[in-house]
Curated annotation (Swiss-Prot):
This is Odorant receptor 30a. One of its GO terms (molecular function) is odorant binding. Keywords: Cell membrane, Membrane, Olfaction, Receptor, Sensory transduction, Transducer, Transmembrane, Transmembrane helix. Interacts with Orco. Complexes exist early in the endomembrane system in olfactory sensory neurons (OSNs), coupling these complexes to the conserved ciliary trafficking pathway. The atypical heteromeric and topological design of the odorant receptors appears to be an insect-specific solution for odor recognition, making the OR/Orco complex an attractive target for the development of highly selective insect repellents to disrupt olfactory-mediated host-seeking behaviors of insect disease vectors. Odor-evoked OR currents are independent of known G-protein-coupled second messenger pathways. InterPro entries: 7tm6_olfct_rcpt (IPR004117). It comes from Drosophila melanogaster.
Length: 377
C-alpha cells in the first residue's frame, strides 16, 4: 500500500531528476518558476542570432556564440516541449511507476537485484550529468575573463543600447544577469537528458526481467510453464507499448538534438584550434566533454535497448523448450517471432538511435570540421 501511494517524484530510479523538474514547474506543478526560468532564455536566444549576424567581435567569440545559440535553442525546445506535453509526460511517468512498483513487489531475488542495479546506474548517470552541467556553467561565466577583449558570457543583441553593452555599468549588470541564468538553464537541459536516460534504462530492465523469466522456465513444473510463457507475452506487449509511448513523446526532439549535436560539436572543434589562451582551450574541452558525454550516454543506452530486446528471443530459445508439449512450444515460438523485431528509440520516427548512427554522425562532423579548418587556414 505504501509503494502504491508513492509520489512519482520520489521514485528512487529517478534520483533528483523529477524533483528538479517539479521545483522549476516543468512537470507536476504549474507556477511562476517556469516563466522565470524560460522567459529570459527565449528572449536571449532570439537576440543571439541577431548578434551573430551583426557581430564585429573576434572569430573565436563569434564561433563560441554560435555554439551557445544552438545550445540555447536546444534548451528552449526541451523546456517548451515539457510545458506543452506536460500531461502526456506525467501519464507516461505514472505508467512507469506502476511497472516499477510491480517489480519492487516481486519475490524473485534476481529481479530485486536487477532493479537495484538499474536504480544505482540511473542515479549515478544523473549525478555525473549534473556535475558536468555545473562545470559547464562555470565555464560559461569564466570563459570571457580569459579573453583579450571585454565580452559577455552569452552573445546578445540589445536594441538602442547595443553599442553600450560593453561599457560600465551596463556590462557588469548584464554579466551578473547572465551568470544567474546559467544554473537555471542547466536545470532545464540536464534533467531532461537524465529523464530520457532513465526511461530507456527502465525499458532495458524490463527486457532483462523477461530474459530472466524465460531462462527460469526449466525450474517450473510442466503445468506452470504455459502460464508463465503467456505472462511473458503479455509483459512483452507492455514493454513494446512502453517503448512506443516513449518514442511518441521524444522522437522529434531526438531529431532536433541530432542536428544540434552535430552543429555544436563541429563548432567546438573549430573553437579548439582558434582558442587564444590555455585557459580558453581547457574550457572549450570541458564544453566538448559535457556535450559529447550527454549524447554518448543517450546513444549507448538506446543501443543497449536495441540489442537487449533481441536477447529476449535468445533467452526463449535457450530454455528447455524441447521438453514442453506441442501447444506450449507453439506459444513459445510465437513469443520468439514477436522478439525478432527489435525495440528501438527512434530519431525523427524513422532511424533507430544506436552507436552505429552515432559513429556515422561523428564521421560527418569530422569531415565538415576538416573542411572548415582548411578554409580558415
Amino acid at each position: 500500500m505504501e509503494l502504491k501511494s508513492m509520489d512519482p517524484v520520489e521514485m528512487p530510479i529517478f534520483g533528483s531528476t523529477l524533483k528538479l523538474m517539479k521545483f522549476w514547474s516543468y512537470l507536476f506543478v504549474h507556477n511562476w518558476r517556469r516563466y522565470v526560468a524560460m522567459t529570459p532564455y527565449i528572449i536571449i536566444n532570439c537576440t543571439q542570432y541577431v548578434d551573430i549576424y551583426l557581430s564585429t567581435e573576434s572569430l573565436d567569440f563569434i564561433i563560441r556564440n554560435v555554439y551557445l545559440a544552438v545550445l540555447f535553442t536546444n534548451t528552449v525546445v526541451r523546456g517548451v516541449l515539457l510545458c506543452v506535453q506536460r500531461f502526456s509526460y506525467e501519464r507516461f511517468i505514472n505508467i512507469l511507476k506502476s511497472f516499477y512498483i510491480e517489480l519492487l513487489q516481486s519475490d524473485d531475488p534476481i529481479i530485486n537485484i536487477l532493479v537495484k542495479e538499474t536504480t544505482r546506474l540511473s542515479v549515478l548517470i544523473s549525478r555525473i550529468n549534473l556535475l558536468m552541467g555545473c562545470c559547464t556553467c562555470i565555464g560559461f561565466v569564466t570563459y570571457p575573463i580569459f579573453g583579450s577583449e571585454r565580452v559577455l558570457p552569452y552573445g546578445m543583441y540589445l536594441p538602442t543600447i547595443d553599442e553600450y553593452k560593453y561599457a560600465s555599468p551596463y556590462y557588469e549588470i548584464f554579466f551578473v544577469i547572465q551568470a544567474i541564468m546559467a544554473p537555471m538553464g542547466c536545470c532545464m537541459y540536464i534533467p531532461y537528458t537524465n529523464m530520457v536516460v532513465t526511461f530507456t534504462l527502465f525499458a532495458i530492465l524490463m527486457c532483462r526481467v523477461l530474459q530472466h523469466k524465460l531462462r527460469s522456465l526449466e525450474k517450473l513444473k510442466n503445468e506452470q510453464v504455459r502460464g508463465e510463457i503467456i505472462w511473458c507475452i503479455k509483459y512483452q506487449l507492455k514493454l513494446s507499448g512502453f517503448v512506443d509511448s516513449m518514442n511518441a513523446l521524444n522522437t522529434h526532439l531526438h531529431l532536433v538534438e541530432f542536428l544540434c549535436f552535430g552543429a555544436m560539436l563541429c563548432v567546438l572543434l573549430f573553437s579548439l584550434i582558434i582558442a587564444q589562451t590555455i585557459a580558453q582551450t581547457v574550457i572549450v574541452i570541458a564544453y566538448m566533454v559535457m556535450i559529447f558525454a550527454n549524447s554518448v550516454v543517450l546513444y549507448y543506452v538506446a543501443n543497449e535497448l536495441y540489442f537487449q530486446s533481441f536477447d529476449i528471443a535468445i533467452a526463449a530459445y535457450e530454455s528447455n523448450w524441447m521438453d514442453f508439449d506441442v501447444d506450449t512450444q507453439k506459444t513459445l515460438k510465437f513469443l520468439i517471432m514477436r522478439s525478432q523485431k527489435p525495440l528501438a528509440i527512434l530519431v525523427g520516427g524513422t532511424y533507430p538511435m544506436n552507436l552505429k548512427m552515432l559513429q556515422s554522425l561523428l564521421n560527418a562532423i569530422y569531415s565538415f570540421f576538416t573542411l572548415l579548418r582548411r578554409v580558415y587556414g
